[in-house]
Structures are given as C-alpha cells and as structure tokens.
Amino acid sequence: MGISLPFFYSDNGVLNKAARIATGDIAGNCHPYKAGLLEEEEICLMAGLDYVTPWTRDTSINAMHAMCFFDSNIVRNSLISVCCSKDGKNIAGGDYWDSIIWAMGAWQYLSLNDDAEFRAFAYDVIKNTLAKFEAEELDSDGLFMGGAVYGDGIAAYPDKYAKTENHGTNIMNWPAANPDKRSKKGFGVPMKTLSTNCVYYAAYIIAGKLAEQLGEDSSEYIAKAQKTKDAVNKNFWNEKTGRYDYLFDDTERCDHSEALGLSFAMLFGIADDAKCESIIKNTYVTDHGIPCVWPSFSRYRIGNDYGRHSGAVWPHAEGFWAVANLRKGNIAGFEKELFSLAHKAVRDLQFAEIYHPVTGEVYGGLQEKAKEGFFLWKSCQKQSWSATAFWAMIIYGIAGIEITDTSIIIKPYLPISVNHAELKNLTVGDAQISIKIDRDSDAPKTIEIPKNLKGKQSYNLSV
C-alpha cells in the first residue's frame, strides 16, 4: 500500500520548495478509504486535510492535474469510490450537475494506463451518466442545466439564486424555495453554465473514444459532442466582452468571467485560436492569480471582502488557466500563476484551498444565510487540488508533457529565471520517467515516446 511520488528540482529555490510542499500535501491526504463501488478498503486521495472523502469533482480534477503521474492505483481507487449504482446501473456520484466530470479523470487515467477492466467499467459509467442527465437536464437549446463546475455554494451565482430553502448555502436548496422559477424538468436549477457544458462536451468526446476502443459505434457520441460545442459557441460567446459569458437562464444573463469555463473552452478545443487570443486579452487576472468568477457579485463587496465562489482565487482553477495560457503562447500569463502560487505555498508551508484576490492571504470568502447574513467561510488546509494544480504547471508547463491518443510528447519550457530543471519518477503506466532539462544544451528540444514503456526511463532535453 505504498505511494509512488515524483520529484522536482531546479536552480530556483522557490519552485523547489513549493514542489516539495505540494508533494507533502498530496501524500498526507492519501488514506485508506472504502465507499461507492470500491469493494475493499484501498488508498484513496482525500480532497484535503479538512476533508474525509475524495469527492467526485476533486478526484477527477486531481487526476487531470497531476495525480496520474504520482500513483495511478490511487487514482483508480478514488475514481471507483465516488461511483454508485442507481436503478441497477453504475453512474458517477457527487453533485448532479457536474458529476460527469468523472469522465475526464477516468480518461486521464486510461491515457496513461492500459487497463482493460477499468476501460469497460469507465465506458459503462460514462454512458449511463450521460443518458441519465440527457433525460433530466438537457434542454431544447442543446445545453445542460445546472450549476457551474464545483460551484456548490450560492456565492457563485447572481442575486436571483441567493434565496434558498431553510436559508442553506448550497445551490441545491434553491429549487424548493423558488417553485415559480424552477425548471420544469430535472432537479430544478434552470441556469446553464459555461464550465459544466464544456465538461459535457469533453465527456461526449471521451465516450466516443472509449466506444471505438471497445469496438462499438462512436458516431452518436461524436455527433452529440459537435452539437454541444456548437451550442456553447452560439449561446455563450459574447462579442462585446471578447469572451464567453458565465451563465444564463430564461430571464437573465451573467457576463462575468469564469476561470474554469474559459480554461476548459481553450484546453478542450471549443474555442478556436481567435477566441483563445481574445479570451486571454479580455479576462481580468488579479495580482494573486485568476479569480474563480470576476467580478465578485456586489452583495459580497463589503469592505475588503469578496464572495467565496466569486472573486476569490482558487488554485485548482489557476492550474487549468496557467496551462491553457502557456499552450496558447501567453508565457507571462503562465508564469504569473506559477510563481504567485509558489510564493504563497512557501510562505504558508501549505497549498491552501482559497486565497484573497488583493492581499494574497489564505482566505475563505463570504458566504451567506438569510437569517445569519454574510459570514466568512474557512479556507481549508492542504487542499489536494491546489497542490496537484501546482504540479500540473510543472508537468504540463515546465516539462511540456502532452498526452496524445498514441504517445507522449515532451516539449519543455523554462521560465526566464530557470536554467535547469529535473523531474524524477513520473509514473507512466508501468514505467517511471525522469526528465532533465537544460537551457541551450545539445539535447533535443522535443521528443515523442510510446506509452507502453516499462521500468526506469531517462531523457535529456534542451530549451
């Protein structure tokens, strides 16, 4: 039941310390756990020091960020533990609106591991989960209703969505308190959000690829993916702001910037090159990283406070934004997130859940209850997806790793203040890969390696 850990070393002390802190936070959150469809107690990755469960979205995002390069068995265990059986069918568990993000974590695992048993399991879960929410939440415009990815708190949403049953803080309490405004089908939250619909697009693409691998017809999923992509571009793109809107329903639209949604649109290929350039140009980034939603909704702008899910800086979103910026050629945008997060981690000796957008301090943001009013929520300690987000910047940024359907491309990049970097013990299936990167050496600048390697493999590269 050991844990496999990668290592990072460079000639930049801040990055080195931050990487060690991130690795420590991740390792400390790996615990024996049994839930969902996991039949026996196994090591799984908890969401953070203050959490006792993996959570579906956290598990998938951790896998997408970096955890598959740490220990793929822990990823596999965690993914199975957040699934459940409903009406005799295996589906992804968790909050209903973004539970399909499970598909992306499963695909990341399968992209690095030839696991026939899990491939069949994943296809079954994804197929059933898509069918369930197509029946319940898919609207006539080709978009899925429900909250934003990870936006469980009402601080993520406009004033309309702040009135909830029993004055609860969760968006799932909204339909019961607003029977005249709830959607006629599904759970009842009528909004459509950018991030969630981007994830559905990705899930359709993944379902199509798994169908092909398993010898089934993929055409239905490919067609649905294209329809979802077209619907996102038609309904969310805003020429006036130069980026995608955050959300809309039948009565109002919110054109705030959503970090995860914009990042997903760029990373998943929903946005073309012109749109990506426009998004980067027209998205506000604070001195301490991209805020989850900006601007913060005005009801939370009390003194120096911001909303928990609107205005605050969440590192798991920073990770996606940083990688998207680098892949689209915005080096400055990548380095801002990389070094900002690294300095805060070294300062605090941990990767916290959330930070203040102006001061950079560990900060949980304002939430609200009608009877209690506004109150400051805790920023949880040693958050797994904050730590894996930093490692994502190392793996996909500095190492420049890109996973294709057939191979792994390594095209490194070094920040201007870094001339040497090493990554050791990255897990890729049955292999442990080490990468040494030097500026202006005679080594190749890009290599492509197969996925079916075994044992220890070392590569030298130059930038």
Pin down the residues of each PLM region:
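Structural helix-adjacent loops and short alpha-helical linkers that scaffold large soluble proteins
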Residues: 5-19, 66-79, 110-127, 141, ...
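Extended glycan-interaction surfaces of carbohydrate-active proteins
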Residues: 5-53, 73-92, 139-191, 229-315, ...
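A structural signal for alpha-helical segments
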Residues: 10, 50, 113-117, 121, ...
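Aromatic-rich carbohydrate-recognition surfaces in CAZymes
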Residues: 53-59, 63-168, 172, 193-201, ...
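Active-site neighborhood of glycoside hydrolase catalytic domains
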Residues: 194-236
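Non-catalytic C-terminal accessory modules of carbohydrate-active enzymes
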Residues: 320, 324-463
